[in-house]
């Protein structure tokens, strides 16, 4: 048997293995397999980072623009609109601060796998240098707050407030936005920047409601129980047996921290995660300070183009994301030339 034949057999066995595993996870109930955080499970969605609900009277006001969401989407919208002259803006945010995903997800080890010089917006405008190539969650959260302060958005925000309805009035050409705090906001424009990574999702495990131990969701990390408000302090778990359900990106970041801190750790895994090198490191201050004005927009566009298969003369980011696209493009080219590498380019994604 030739070396190529042996390689092809290994590839086929691997494909079959993943086909079988994939079929195990194809379910007729789809996303309905998960339990909604309401009723007896509503406590999973409570905000552990805000002391109390800030009391205020319902507001009825007219504004130019209502932005729903105080994460990067909402912050960018507000910042860009402010830059072109709009000052009458109201931001509606369910959390008690800006940050969106990074307000809610404060679990130990939280980190972004997109390069900070691309992912963290408005670095030039705010005048901030990320501390490392792939920033941790607390730094990203603080940058969100810095954006809010830099553009004066705190005075224009309604925190701990959720939009419950929006109605368009054709006669007056205005939106009427209603909130769970009894507010009625009238605006010419409505911007929805709500995102999809802020709502907890529970596994549909029979009997989960009967568990008698302490239980919380990673996106509502209970630091009062695990140690303190310090993300590095899990000292209260030293004598605890802990189970974590799930082995996705969050677990990959949480598990090493838990393993060092608890008496015994159980990781409940259905599907193994893809693991690769982190490739992280501190920001080169000299490099950063010598970047030319407009560098971030150029870098973001370059990264977007490369990861979407658009030809660029230079790969400015040159990390795992861009390398993956380079490999896919090369596999497609080889296939087009009639060279069988034994690899379906789409399987690389």
Regions found by a protein language model. Give the residues of each.
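N-terminal FAD-binding dinucleotide-binding subdomain shared by FAD-dependent oxidases/monooxygenases
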Residues: 2-65, 82-209, 234-237, 247, ...
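Conserved hydrophobic packing residues within short motifs/helices of P-loop NTPase cores
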Residues: 66-68, 243
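Glycine-rich Rossmann-fold phosphate-binding loop(s) that bind the pyrophosphate
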Residues: 69-75, 247-248
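Short alpha-helical segment within the catalytic ATP-binding CA
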Residues: 75-76, 253
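Aromatic pocket-lining residues of Rossmann-like dinucleotide-binding sites
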Residues: 81, 257-258
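A conserved hydrophobic secondary-structure block that centers on an alpha-helix together
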Residues: 92, 215, 220, 230, ...
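Short glycine-/polar-rich loops that comprise or flank the Walker A/P-loop
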Residues: 213, 262-263
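Mid-domain beta-loop-alpha active-site segment that forms a flexible
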Residues: 247-257
């Amino acid at each position: 048997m030739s070396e190529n034949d042996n390689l092809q057999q290994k590839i086929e066995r691997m494909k079959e293995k993943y086909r079988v595993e994939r079929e195990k996870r194809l379910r007729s109930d789809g996303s309905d397999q998960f339990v909604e955080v309401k009723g007896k499970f509503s406590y999973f969605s409570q905000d552990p980072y805000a002391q109390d609900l800030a009391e205020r009277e319902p507001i009825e006001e007219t504004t130019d623009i209502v932005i729903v969401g105080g994460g990067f989407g909402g912050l960018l919208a507000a910042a860009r609109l402010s830059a072109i002259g709009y000052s009458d803006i109201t931001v509606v945010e369910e959390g008690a601060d800006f940050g969106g995903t990074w307000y809610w997800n404060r679990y130990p080890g939280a980190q972004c796998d997109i390069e900070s010089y691309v992912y963290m917006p408005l670095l030039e405008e705010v005048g901030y240098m990320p501390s490392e190539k792939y920033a941790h969650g607390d730094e990203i959260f603080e940058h969100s707050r810095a954006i809010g302060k830099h553009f004066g958005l705190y005075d224009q925000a309604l925190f701990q407030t959720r939009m419950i309805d929006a109605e368009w009035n054709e006669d007056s050409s205005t939106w009427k936005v209603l909130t769970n705090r009894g507010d009625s906001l009238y605006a010419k424009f409505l911007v929805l920047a709500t995102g999809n990574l802020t709502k907890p999702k529970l596994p549909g495990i029979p009997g989960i409601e009967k568990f008698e131990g302490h239980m919380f969701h990673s996106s509502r990390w209970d630091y009062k129980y695990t140690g303190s408000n310090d993300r590095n302090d899990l000292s209260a778990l030293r004598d605890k047996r802990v189970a974590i359900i799930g082995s996705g990106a969050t677990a990959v970041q949480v598990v090493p921290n838990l393993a060092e801190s608890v008496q015994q750790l159980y990781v409940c895994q259905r599907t193994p995660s893809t693991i690769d090198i982190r490739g992280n490191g501190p920001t080169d201050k000299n490099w950063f300070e010598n970047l030319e004005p407009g560098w971030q927009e150029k870098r973001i566009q370059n990264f977007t183009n490369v990861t979407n298969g658009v030809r660029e003369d230079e790969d400015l980011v040159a990390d795992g994301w861009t390398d993956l696209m380079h490999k896919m493009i090369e596999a497609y080219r080889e296939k087009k030339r009639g060279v069988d590498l034994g690899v379906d380019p789409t399987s690389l994604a």
